[in-house]
Amino acid sequence: MKQIIKNIYYIGDNGCSVYLVDTQSDQGLLLIDAGMDLNMIKQIDSHGMKLKNIQHCIITHCHIDHIGICAELKRELPNIQFYGHALDAVPIEESGHDDRTAASWYGVIHEPVKLYQKFTSDTVLKLGSYDFQCIHTPGHTPGSISVLVESEGKKVLFGQDLHGPFNEGFLSNLQDYQMSMQKLLDLQADILCEGHFGIFQPASQVRQYIETHKHQNQTQFI
């Protein structure tokens, strides 16, 4: 676990990169995705935080490497609230969508979990003094979202899986992806926390990463 900027942390990577924000309020801690290993998240207890203080989790999209332990996390923390986009809600909340969740890729079974809030448009989630801009960025999946939040005057973008991949089983759409990437470029983020390939800063590196994948993924379907 390491601090990225004040109150924003990288917990680790198991399935995907999992990030945490300390709202410094009675709203407690917020996760960006959950990954596939609850023990990895439990390690925050040894870094001066408490698992029991995790109250929120924003699910960036419906893939198993990002939501694999959500049901387990709900049993551990019954009051945790999950957020996601309505267009990815069915495979998150129901079983039997192994292509949509990519569970078939991993040879696992998805255990459904209910969303507390389903976004239908760009939405600001206010927790403590933080405004989490939940931005609809379809392409990788129909309900993919990216999250923008400010800390110490820096724009921090959680852009999970901006690299893809794109697959018919995921209901990917490359035209949507191109528009989504332009939307993210227009945000002019200072820090990018990606889902699998690390943390990019300053703003010039964020722009380069997004532009590179935007260019590469014009026709790249698998």
List the model feature ranges, each with a label:
Residues 37-41, 45-123:
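Active-site HxH/HxHxD metal-binding segment of metal-dependent hydrolases
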Residues 9-11, 114-116, 136-140:
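Short Gly/Pro-enriched turn/cap motifs at secondary-structure boundaries
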Residues 37, 124, 130-214, 221:
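Metallo-beta-lactamase
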Residues 1-47, 146-162:
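Conserved beta-strand hairpin/beta-sheet module of binuclear metal-dependent hydrolase folds
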Residues 1-6, 103-107, 128-132:
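Short Pro/Gly-enriched beta-strand edge/turn motifs at strand-loop
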Residues 30, 58, 82, 156-158, ...:
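Residue-level marker for buried hydrophobic side chains located in beta-strands
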